[in-house]
Amino acid sequence: MSKNKDQRTAKTLEKTWDTLNHLLFISSGLYKLNLKSIAQITLSILAMIISTSLIITAIIFIASANHKVTLTTAIIQDATSQIKNTTPTYLTQDPQLGISFSNLSEITSQTTTILASTTPGVKSNLQPTTVKTKNTTTTQTQPSKPTTKQRQNKPPNKPNNDFHFEVFNFVPCSICSNNPTCWAICKRIPNKKPGKKTTTKPTKKPTFKTTKKDLKPQTTKPKEVPTTKPTEEPTINTTKTNITTTLLTNNTTGNPKLTSQMETFHSTSSEGNLSPSQVSTTSEHPSQPSSPPNTTRQ
């Protein structure tokens, strides 16, 4: 019945807390509006009332929580008193009478120790906790969380009944005295322990720098062949020697110019070109008939 009452009171307190919070929110919103002075005064009074009621509900919550704490302490005190009143007995062996009973109160003091049962495989660390009561103090040792270590599965031991030759890896040569078969089978035990293997780091090979040649073909311009223009052949002036020209003309007195012109013509006949004087003389006298000269070669 007491539990039901506590639940009801808790529910009613929660409801009142929620309603008061809503009222406070509404009143603060209305107060922000520009109302008349009387309305603002009433809203402020309501806000004060709601805040005081909220404080009261908070106090009730705290009181109910303290009541629950006092109930738990009372239960602990009752349990300790029951333990004190009941004095358990244990058996002791007497050589004359056989078995006799004796009380724990004669041996143990006011502090009662409660030991937790521990399994043989798991170790538990005991942590003492003290509980204060009105008259006596009881120390209870509670086991902490056990630390379970995983056991390594050992391989099963093989029976040593069968003595087989494969069990022995080698026969030491110190046993063999004169047996040739033993010397053939035996192995010598090395005196020195095998040393550490020396690890040689590979040395870096020297890198040769190679300059890449230009693979492009060198374009050489062909040499210009000098073109020689044909030069004009030199004109050779050939003068005929031992040639006597005798001009036998009938009319020597008639045209003295004509004879002189013909002489010049024969002297320049070996050359290919005509002189301007010849051209001019021929053009001046086209109509005059020229008598063929009679040339005699000696």
Curated annotation (Swiss-Prot):
It comes from the Viruses. Disulfide bonds join 173-186, 176-182. Keywords: Disulfide bond, Glycoprotein, Host cell membrane, Host membrane, Host-virus interaction, Membrane, Secreted, Transmembrane, Transmembrane helix, Viral attachment to host cell, Viral immunoevasion, Virion, Virus entry into host cell. Residues 190-207 have a biased composition (Basic residues). One of its GO terms (biological process) is symbiont entry into host cell. Belongs to the pneumoviruses glycoprotein G family. This is Major surface glycoprotein G. It comes from Human respiratory syncytial virus. The gene is G.
